[in-house]
């Protein structure tokens, strides 16, 4: 089946789209990417999304106009990726602007902006969307959703495999080996903490939005990190909490950046960005170290995906702190960096049609595995 997958992450960079074909066993499908596109949001739309997600005041009219603009942008991206309209369905994540994990007796909640009926009409095909709500309703974290999909797309090897997504938030998937005592272990995954979100916000704030991210890590490269601050931050409650766990800009956003800026003993932009970059790498390394201490699991391979994989400073710092693992870009196994997440949501849409559960207790803490997503048709 031909399926479109569309994704925009917490960094609000734009929309990545793939046109893929899936056949065979849904647990280990045969798949190929026919086409892929990436479209950056125009600066005014990107800033509106960030402002809304940071809690800035929006009228009802402004919210409707924002949701229409996002939906129309998704439609443009879909038509660009599939100009002949061969896809039968589209799996569309929508634009995340709020994510609240469950806490105690309070269930979690997540908001992805998308007018799915409008999108279905604009692209004239069935749209599967709202993938997180059912997991949350069943007591899960609602994120991350990609670990089961990573396992299906990438498969197992002789040891544990890890896939690290460096979006606004860093999340990790762990795929058990194909043989040995861990063969029957479940796929694991969780949100580690900030990857790009604090770095991007710092760059935007310090450059008055002339820059939106640290291109090629050049700002961080020329800075001196505050390791005392990093060590202090790594002891915060979220980083000590075991999985399942999820997070977002609500926890690691502008207010969090401002708090951290008061705790750094260096005031220059390059030192701030360097500190935040190494902090992101340390968060990931600490989680993998804790995984080994608690479960005796140490991946032999770590594939890195997402926009942060294109930051050579962040990539290098992760490599330095993950010794004993073969650390490489996910592009080396045939999945382009920007295609990995839209490919997983294309697969999740296919799974929805097949009535195959896309969530797992071992990953999100959901009470039972569930088929994810909601269908809307163009007619």
From Swiss-Prot:
Pathway: Amino-sugar metabolism; 1,6-anhydro-N-acetylmuramate degradation; Cell wall biogenesis; peptidoglycan recycling. It catalyses: 1,6-anhydro-N-acetyl-beta-muramate + ATP + H2O = N-acetyl-D-muramate 6-phosphate + ADP + H(+). It holds the Pfam family AnmK. GO terms for biological process: 1,6-anhydro-N-acetyl-beta-muramic acid catabolic process; amino sugar metabolic process; peptidoglycan turnover. InterPro entries: Anhydro_N_Ac-Mur_kinase (IPR005338), ATPase_NBD (IPR043129). Its EC number is 2.7.1.170. Coiled coil: none annotated. ATP binds at residues 9-16. GO terms for molecular function: ATP binding; kinase activity; phosphotransferase activity, alcohol group as acceptor. Keywords: ATP-binding, Carbohydrate metabolism, Kinase, Nucleotide-binding, Transferase. Belongs to the anhydro-N-acetylmuramic acid kinase family. Catalyzes the specific phosphorylation of 1,6-anhydro-N-acetylmuramic acid (anhMurNAc) with the simultaneous cleavage of the 1,6-anhydro ring, generating MurNAc-6-P. Is required for the utilization of anhMurNAc either imported from the medium or derived from its own cell wall murein, and thus plays a role in cell wall recycling. This is Anhydro-N-acetylmuramic acid kinase. It comes from Prochlorococcus marinus (strain MIT 9211). The gene is anmK.
């Amino acid at each position: 089946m031909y399926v479109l997958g569309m994704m925009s992450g917490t960094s609000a960079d734009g929309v990545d789209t793939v046109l893929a074909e899936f056949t065979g066993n849904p647990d280990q499908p045969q798949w190929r990417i026919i086409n892929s596109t990436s479209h950056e949001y125009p600066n005014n739309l990107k800033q509106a999304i960030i402002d809304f997600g940071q809690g800035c005041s929006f009228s009802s009219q402004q919210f409707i106009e924002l949701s229409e603009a996002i939906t129309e942008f998704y439609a443009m991206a879909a038509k660009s990726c599939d100009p002949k309209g061969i896809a039968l369905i589209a799996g569309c994540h929508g634009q995340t602007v709020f994510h609240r994990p469950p806490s105690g007796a309070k269930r979690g909640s997540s908001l992805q902006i998308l007018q799915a009926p409008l999108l279905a009409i604009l692209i004239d095909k069935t749209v599967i969307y709202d993938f997180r709500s059912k997991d949350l309703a069943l007591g899960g974290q609602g994120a991350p959703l990609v670990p089961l999909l990573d396992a299906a797309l990438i498969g197992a090897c002789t040891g544990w495999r890890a896939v690290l997504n460096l979006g606004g938030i860093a999340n990790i998937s762990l795929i058990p080996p194909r043989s040995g005592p861990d063969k029957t272990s479940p796929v694991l995954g969780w949100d580690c903490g900030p990857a790009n979100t604090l770095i991007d916000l710092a760059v935007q704030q310090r450059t008055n939005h002339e820059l939106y991210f640290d291109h090629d890590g050049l700002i961080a490269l020329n800075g001196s990190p505050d390791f005392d601050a990093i060590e202090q931050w790594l002891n915060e409650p979220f980083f000590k909490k075991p999985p399942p766990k999820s997070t977002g800009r609500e926890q690691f956003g502008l207010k969090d950046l401002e708090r951290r800026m008061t705790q750094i003993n260096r005031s220059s932009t390059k030192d701030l960005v360097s500190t935040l970059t190494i902090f992101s790498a340390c968060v990931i390394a600490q989680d993998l170290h804790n995984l080994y201490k608690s479960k005796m699991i140490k991946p032999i391979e770590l594939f890195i995906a997402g926009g942060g994989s294109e930051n050579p400073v962040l990539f290098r710092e992760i490599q330095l702190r993950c010794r004993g693992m073969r650390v490489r870009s996910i592009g080396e196994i045939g999945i382009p960096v920007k295609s990995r997440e839209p490919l997983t949501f294309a697969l999740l849409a296919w799974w929805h049609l097949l009535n195959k559960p896309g969530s797992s207790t071992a990953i999100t803490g959901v009470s039972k595995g569930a088929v994810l997503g909601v269908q809307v048709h163009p007619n």
